[in-house]
Amino acid sequence: MPKQVIIPPGTTTPIAPFVPGTLADGVVYVSGTLPFDKQNNVVHIGDPKAQTRHVLETIKSVIETAGGSMADVTFNSIFITDWTNYAAINEVYAEFFPGDKPARFCIQCGLVKPDALVEIASVAHIGTPT
């Protein structure tokens, strides 16, 4: 099965040469997702919970556009700028993964825009869309 580009309706053009997601062999690969509005500006500056919610809603949109759901997520790569935000980010993260949790890692690092506090990339196994 060839690779399929996944771009949810209303998605802005990324600021670099990539797409929001790709689907190949029943697996959705979601690009690193930042708390950006449609003009690629950081939203909810200073609020790690709101930024995390925005990021996960964006990821959810990509996965649902591909025919899956957040329950299909098997792995998340999480990048945060400050460990003091870790608990707040986890609180919102748990809302999106209430059942069995996906595997993940979380590292502290700098992000592409200074006001961004969190970035998440995801992998979801959705099987063959019907």
Swiss-Prot record:
BP-aspect Gene Ontology terms: nitrogen utilization; uracil catabolic process
A Gene Ontology cellular-component term: cytosol
Catalytic activity, reaction form: (Z)-3-aminoacrylate + H2O + H(+) = 3-oxopropanoate + NH4(+)
Signal peptide as annotated in the record: none
GO molecular function: deaminase activity
InterPro entries: RidA_CS, RutC, RutC-like_sf, YjgF/YER057c/UK114
Pfam family, one: Ribonuc_L-PSP
Family according to the record: Belongs to the RutC family.
Function text: Involved in pyrimidine catabolism. Catalyzes the deamination of 3-aminoacrylate to malonic semialdehyde, a reaction that can also occur spontaneously. RutC may facilitate the reaction and modulate the metabolic fitness, rather than catalyzing essential functions.
Protein name (Swiss-Prot/TrEMBL): 3-aminoacrylate deaminase RutC
Organism: Klebsiella variicola (strain At-22)
